[in-house]
Structures are given as structure tokens and as C-alpha cells.
Amino acid sequence: PSLTGIFMASELMATAVNAQLKRAGKDAAVGDPDSVIRVAIDGTPQGLQLIRDGALDATVSQPLSAYATKTAELIELVSKGGTIELGPKPDGQVIDTPVGPQYQLNATLVTKENVDAPGLWANQL
């Protein structure tokens, strides 16, 4: 079968994925027409370095400080009897799911074009 892309639920998987691609002879460099596209999620300093090194095409940045702040805000809201309203928010959106409301914070796709942007949380550490 033809493999064109891999999504990793964490950048921590990239080293193992890249090793298996090499073993299978599918380790063409990022950007090469024969390359398997590799995308992950987290946006950690290590993930950004993988992009700089050409070992990962992209990652979705999940700013830990924003997640922690929003979690604290929502805990305070709910503990005081408030409810989480569905709909668009300045920093994302709240959608309804079978298990309750889900707050989806805005996320940035990081590629070689913006990997060094100072606004990325991992570049601020």
C-alpha cells in the first residue's frame, strides 16, 4: 500500500516513526516529493527542533499556559454555579459533545515557515 502521511498524537512518537520509515526505505527528507508527510501535535521545544531538523513536516502548537489558565477559569466558573455556554469565544469555541461541552482553544499549525516565531509558546521557554 502507498503511505503518504502519518499523524502522531504526540511529537514524542516522531523518533520511533522516523526509525520505522527508515527501516521501510521511506525516509525521504521533508519536502522531497517521495517523503511521507509527518504531522504531530503539541508544539514542544523538541517538536519545533524536529521541524528545524527536517524530521517533522508540521505540528499543532498547544500552548500549555493557555490550557492551564483556561482550565482554572472554567473550574472557577463551574464551582460558582456558572455554566459553559456553547459557541464562539475570543480564544476558541465551545462545542457540544456526547460527554458535555468541549472548549477548543485556537491552535497554530507550525511548519518550517513559522517555526522560529517568537509568539509560539515553546520559543518562549
Per-range role (PLM):
Residues 35, 55-56, 106:
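A generic structural signal for alpha->beta connector loops
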Residues 42-43, 62, 109:
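Flexible, solvent-exposed loop/hinge segments that line or gate ligand/substrate-binding clefts
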Residues 2-3, 27, 56-57, 85, ...:
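A general structural signal for well-ordered secondary-structure junctions
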